[in-house]
């Protein structure tokens, strides 16, 4: 008798469309060319490549250009086809790409920094080129003349850069874990405020100008959502990676955040839910549930003739508790904890199954990601990894 084969339930996951190989070193940055089946990449091997899809279905370089120094970052403007490339020697080189993307014409070079350029943004509306470098300098230049308009010294090397055109606010994330907000004028800037919420360095920034929300990723494995538009100082933490968060991208039309990490994980977060701030951790000399003293509370230990215990914290209420009163674990997705974390026994009983429902999906890119670019129109995601490979994914099964 033949056994009936039950079809497997369909799991929604990204579809790998293409792999692009050939770089001798890591591809530090790459972008999907809008309205074209093409990709522009810059690599540590000093090459700039424009990959176009051939009749065979494979992507091959139509432009292969060697730079005088390793390429650390880039910014591409599709309307003007202007390509700004940051180099390891501190130079920014600008090119114009031909309409068919088969030719790259040099426009100008300028010495923007004393050492490696870490981030570049080209702002078409103001004709500015914003950049940060390992010299701890943020600078902005006129893209027409190449003239330096102004600068600001950051507290540490910057690794994240975003700009809001409407308010002329620039957001700079650095290795100290700080996010600095500056207001830019034509030739000067003023410090607006600084945010500090990460225990590690900021590795990526993403700005949503519609909701006026800033996302920051960090080497502490977390993402923080800073609600600037709400004007209440709300900061929501998202915990979904096992390694440093390397890149962030936001899909405005579906209100989903894509975070990618050194663990190879692609996490898609539903930001269209009412999320809650994580509570401040409370300090206490004894367990706030059973009143047992903690190990540094010698007086209570002596008076009660009890051995001091180690202090823990409930992730839901923030109370200081002992191990016995916090023996349970639970995920709390609305607080950003997609993995199970320590909670006190009373909070564990109070958390409902609905509150445990996941608000993120997890996918494996099978390479340690260093950079991503999301094309919202087609729903394509580009990932670049430490394996020197560029991968192109169709994200429509999970970003919709």
From Swiss-Prot:
Residues reported to bind Zn(2+) 1: 287, 290, 322, 325
A GO MF label: zinc ion binding
Predominant location: other
Matches recorded under SUPFAM superfamilies: FYVE/PHD zinc finger (SSF57903), WD40 repeat-like (SSF50978)
Domain notes: The FYVE-type zinc finger is essential for its vesicular localization.
Assembly and oligomerization: Homodimer. Interacts (via WD repeats 1-3) with AKT1, AKT2, PRKCZ and PRKCI. Interacts with VAMP2. Forms a complex with VAMP2 and PRKCZ. Interacts with FOXO1. Forms a complex with AKT1 and FOXO1.
Protein name: WD repeat and FYVE domain-containing protein 2
Native source organism of the sequence: Homo sapiens
């Amino acid at each position: 008798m033949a056994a009936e084969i039950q079809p497997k339930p369909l799991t929604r996951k990204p579809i790998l469309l293409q792999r692009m190989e050939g770089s001798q070193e890591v591809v530090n940055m790459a972008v999907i060319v809008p309205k074209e089946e093409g990709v522009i990449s810059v690599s540590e091997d000093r090459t700039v490549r424009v990959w176009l899809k051939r009749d065979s279905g494979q992507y091959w370089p139509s432009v292969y250009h060697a730079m005088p120094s390793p390429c650390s970052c880039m910014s591409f403007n599709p309307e003007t086809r202007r390509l700004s490339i940051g180099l390891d020697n501190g130079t920014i080189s600008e090119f114009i790409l031909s309409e068919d993307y088969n030719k790259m014409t040099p426009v100008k070079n300028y010495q923007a920094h004393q050492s490696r350029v870490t981030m570049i943004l080209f702002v078409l509306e103001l004709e500015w080129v914003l950049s940060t470098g390992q010299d701890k300098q943020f600078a902005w230049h006129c893209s027409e003349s190449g003239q330096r308009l102004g600068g600001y010294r950051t507290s540490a090397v910057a690794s994240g850069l975003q700009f809001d055109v409407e308010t002329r606010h620039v957001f700079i994330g650095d290795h100290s874990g700080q996010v600095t907000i500056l207001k830019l004028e034509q030739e000067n800037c003023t410090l607006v405020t600084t945010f500090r919420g990460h225990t590690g360095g900021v590795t990526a920034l993403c700005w949503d100008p519609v909701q006026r929300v800033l996302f920051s990723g960090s080497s502490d494995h977390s993402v923080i959502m800073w609600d600037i538009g709400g004007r209440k100082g709300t900061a929501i933490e998202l915990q979904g990676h096992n390694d440093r968060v390397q890149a962030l991208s936001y899909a405005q039309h579906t209100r989903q955040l894509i975070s990618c990490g050194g663990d190879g994980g692609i996490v898609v977060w539903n930001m269209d839910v009412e999320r809650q701030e994580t509570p401040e951790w409370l300090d206490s000399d004894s367990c706030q549930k059973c009143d047992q003293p903690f190990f540094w509370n010698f007086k209570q230990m002596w008076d009660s003739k009890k051995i001091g215990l180690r202090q823990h914290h409930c992730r839901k209420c923030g109370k200081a508790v002992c191990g016995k009163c916090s023996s349970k674990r639970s995920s709390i997705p609305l607080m950003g904890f997609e993995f199970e974390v320590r909670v006190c026994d009373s909070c564990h009983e109070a958390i409902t199954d609905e509150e445990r429902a996941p608000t993120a999906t997890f996918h494996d890119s099978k390479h340690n990601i260093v950079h991503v670019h999301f094309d919202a129109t087609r729903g394509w995601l580009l990932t670049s990894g430490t394996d020197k490979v560029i991968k192109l994914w169709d994200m429509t099964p999970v970003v919709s």
